[in-house]
Design a protein with these regions (language model features):
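Conserved catalytic core of the tyrosine transesterase superfamily
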Residues: 1-319
Length: 319
């Protein structure tokens, strides 16, 4: 099935050509209005597809080419990546059709099912304790060490994502129900509205870091120490590298243990520490309980003790 026939059948000009020009791709992302992380991932997905087309001498792809590309992906990347790349293609070709630029040749391509289990492992309480003790020992190194301990303690007891840590501002820390709470901008949210209760230790670690930094109230919570962008907001990639480096320092080095493992660790320990599944769901900021059972909107996040129970379990464990 050639492109001209496909285009004519779709009610588009028979001369329709594949819109791979940078300005067309930019228009797609402007239309999509996606979060920066999503745009970055979809950009990577489209670049990979465009490269595959070029390598195979394909100028105007058809649905048969999409099927061939799917087979190529399934043979070369992980199922989760296949799902991401095909999702990006489906959205892109839906847009090209809506804009009368090119037929929607990816509409019927299904992504492979991915397993329900997490692609990342969690630390044991003992390993988490070792990580925190190692991070705390760096406090004597000055500002960078104070930041390291504050980030590690926040992520292991509160379970925020790297992007949530990066987006956090000092002004997002407020009082609620008698204690300090950090409100983070969760996945798919336009503002910082998901509360993470700060344990006394996490609050003290953050205060110590901010005091040493001489931080102002309108600044990001965590800033870069790099000579290239010192004082600027710490990126999510930098947060991820920081935690991964800490793991390696502790002798904990596995492809399945990444910075996101701190979130799985906090969730696992919270569940094992006897917290109600509804509390754990709210603790993680899930929109529903598809991953943690049935969501209960009546649960009050700021009165939950998930963070404290996670910290207690970590510091009582041996390594």
């Amino acid at each position: 099935m050639d492109t001209a026939i496909t285009a004519t059948a779709a009610g588009l000009p028979a001369t329709a050509h594949f819109p791979s020009e940078p300005d067309k791709v930019r228009s797609f992302f402007d239309f999509l209005d996606a979060a920066p992380t999503t745009e970055r991932n979809y950009t990577k997905a489209l670049k990979r597809f465009f490269s595959w087309l070029a390598e195979n001498g394909i100028k105007n792809p058809t649905d048969s080419h999409i099927r061939a590309y799917k087979k190529h992906l399934m043979a070369t990347v992980k199922p989760g990546s296949v799902h991401l790349y095909l999702t990006a293609l489906r959205l892109f070709f839906r847009w090209t059709f809506d804009q009368r630029l090119y037929p929607n040749i990816a509409d019927h391509i299904k992504a492979p099912r991915t397993g329900r289990s997490h692609s990342r492992d969690s630390l044991t309480p003992g390993q988490a304790h070792l990580v925190l003790d190692t991070a705390k020992a760096h406090e004597r190194d000055g500002l960078s060490g104070l930041k390291l301990y504050a980030i590690a303690l926040l992520m292991l007891t509160g379970g925020p994502r790297c992007i949530e840590v990066s987006r956090a501002n000092i002004a997002d820390i407020r009082q609620a129900d008698g204690h300090r709470v950090l409100y983070v901008q969760g996945k798919g949210h336009a503002e910082a509205d998901r509360p993470i209760n700060l344990t006394e230790e996490a609050d003290a670690a953050i205060r110590a870091y901010l005091t040493a930094r001489r931080a102002k109230p309108d600044e990001p919570l965590f800033t870069s120490d790099s000579n290239n962008n010192r004082g600027e907001r710490m990126t999510s990639d930098a947060v991820s590298r920081t935690i991964k480096g800490l793991f390696r320092e502790c002798g904990i080095d596995s492809p399945r243990l990444t910075a996101h493992s701190t979130r799985h660790t906090a969730a696992t320990i919270a569940s094992q520490s006897g917290n109600a599944i509804e509390d754990v769901s709210c603790f993680l900021g899930h929109a529903d309980l598809s991953t943690t059972m049935i969501y209960d909107h009546a649960v009050s996040r700021t009165t939950s003790r998930c963070e404290q129970s996670v910290q207690n379990a970590i510091f009582s464990a041996r390594y």
